[in-house]
């Protein structure tokens, strides 16, 4: 909890209020499978954008290939959004329809 002080200029009173701080939301970045993007390109994206090892990247790629989607990582809003944009730009530059999405992670 943090203290916030409010000053009322008309009455010249200082009021102390307790404010409960809330942790910022985290976002899951999900890679989506498609029938056109080569598996090796997906592995490269996971290594380059998400800094995963080759083995981790292959596991994530296979999960997306089998189930249709896979978790790439959990990040703050700004980082997650940046990673989604990076994937979309790189895929577009290479002529692939690869997509990522981001969704709010449920609080436990």
Swiss-Prot record:
NCBIfam families: PRK00033.1-5 (NF000672)
Its biological purpose: Involved in the modulation of the specificity of the ClpAP-mediated ATP-dependent protein degradation.
Pfam families: ClpS
GO process terms (BP): protein catabolic process; proteolysis
Annotated organism of origin: Leptospira borgpetersenii serovar Hardjo-bovis (strain JB197)
Superkingdom classification of source: Bacteria
Description of how the protein assembles with itself and partners: Binds to the N-terminal domain of the chaperone ClpA.
Alphabetical list of HAMAP family matching this protein: ClpS (MF_00302)
Protein's name according to its UniProt entry: ATP-dependent Clp protease adapter protein ClpS
UniProt similarity note: Belongs to the ClpS family.
């Amino acid at each position: 909890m943090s203290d916030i002080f409010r000053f009322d200029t008309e009455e010249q009173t200082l009021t102390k209020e307790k404010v409960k701080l809330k942790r910022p939301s985290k976002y899951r970045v999900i890679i989506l499978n498609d029938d056109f993007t080569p598996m090796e390109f997906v592995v490269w994206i996971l290594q380059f954008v998400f800094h995963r090892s080759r083995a981790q990247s292959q596991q994530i790629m296979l999960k997306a290939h089998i189930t249709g989607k896979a978790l790439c990582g959990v990040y703050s809003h700004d980082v997650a959004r940046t990673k989604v944009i990076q994937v979309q730009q790189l895929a577009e530059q290479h002529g692939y329809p690869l997509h990522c999405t981001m969704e709010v992670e449920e609080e436990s």
